[in-house]
Amino acid sequence: MRILVIGASGMLGSAVCQVLPRATAISRGAGNFDIDDLHIDGYDWIINAVGVTKPMAQRDDLYRVNAQFPRDLANASERAGARVIQIATDGVFSGARGRYKESDPHDATDDYGRSKSLGEIHSPNFVNLRCSIIGPEPHEPRYLLEWLRRQPPSATVRGFTNHLWNGITTLHFARIVAGIVNNDLAVPSVQHVIPTGAITKANLLRELARAYGRTDLRIEDAEAPESIDRTLITERPDVNAALWRAAAYDQPPTIPQMIDELV
């Protein structure tokens, strides 16, 4: 079985390559992926871990990488007889109400959410695993975990009590991908991947600080100007449970459990 990981040097792709070391890794800048240069013939599975996210967002790159590239990849992989697993995002939802299920209409109003919505491919050979992720970054730090870890000693940081989250870590996303590949699981074209429970962003910071030995930090509760709840639920809890079982979990882990395993 041959596996190709696209975007292997990023936060997510590097985690997938650690869990699937036999995979072929392609690492390029987010704007430098051309489907004609990837040579996907002969691969059984393609993991698309490339994407342009909000901290990096340039409008043209967002739509080229997040929307057009998955469409090109879907067409090429179908011709090559390969199956694709791609991370999708809770960012397709506005966060106005929370507990979004797979069939809920996308209502994001920003270019990032819209570009990711356009990049969700509905095809028999294409799986979109929708979730939010956190994890360590191998290169330039941009996101929540590395931001927290790089705070100066005894710093005070604000954590929002009106932002809710029920995502997973990059390690656990990678384990789920490995479970799908190794067990040849049939997964719907869009499937939410959810843990047990949800957490506020303030308490998420506290869990990360605890696990990474940053107990010197003071996490101060704060309310953001706008409440955001992009928590996900699933219309297919049996599929969510099967994904976690294939990743060697009897039941979906809690957020604190995943963070402890990430360290």
Language-model segments: which ranges?
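NAD(P)H-binding glycine-rich loop region in Rossmannoid oxidoreductase-like domains
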Residues: 34-72, 76-78
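Conserved Rossmann-fold NAD(P)-dependent oxidoreductase catalytic core, especially the SDR/UDP-sugar
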Residues: 72-109
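Active-site YXXXK catalytic motif of short-chain dehydrogenase/reductase
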Residues: 112-116, 130
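NAD(P)-dependent short-chain dehydrogenase/reductase
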Residues: 121-165, 171-172, 178-179
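N-terminal Rossmann NAD(P)H-binding glycine-rich loop of SDR-like oxidoreductase domains
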Residues: 1-20
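Mid/C-terminal beta-alpha module of Rossmann-like enzyme folds, strongest
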Residues: 174-179, 183-230
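SDR active-site strand-loop-helix element
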Residues: 6, 46-50, 84-90, 129-131
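Conserved C-terminal active-site "lid" loop/helix of NAD(P)H-dependent oxidoreductases
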Residues: 170, 198-206, 221-263
